[in-house]
From Swiss-Prot:
The gene is rpmG1. GO terms for biological process: translation. HAMAP family: Ribosomal_bL33. This is Large ribosomal subunit protein bL33A. Transmembrane segments: none annotated. One of its GO terms (molecular function) is structural constituent of ribosome. The keyword Membrane does not apply. GO terms for cellular component: cytoplasm; ribonucleoprotein complex; ribosome. Keywords: Ribonucleoprotein, Ribosomal protein. It comes from the Bacteria. Gene3D superfamilies: Ribosomal protein L33. Belongs to the bacterial ribosomal protein bL33 family.
Length: 55
């Protein structure tokens, strides 16, 4: 099993507008200790929106 101090944990990206969790990705905790925010396509909204790391 993965430990809680894993360097590359799986994270879920949720749309800022509709709050749907659309993407699952990995991030490097050493390079990005803060919450990740990326502009990606939201299929629910039908356009590109900011997606933020959700817990």
């Amino acid at each position: 099993m993965a430990s809680s101090t894993d360097v590359r944990p799986k994270i879920t990206l949720a749309c800022e507008v509709c709050k749907h969790r659309n993407y699952i990705t990995k991030k490097n905790r050493r390079n990005d200790p803060d919450r990740l925010e990326i502009k990606k396509f939201c299929p629910n909204c039908g356009k590109h929106q900011a997606h933020k790391e959700s817990r």
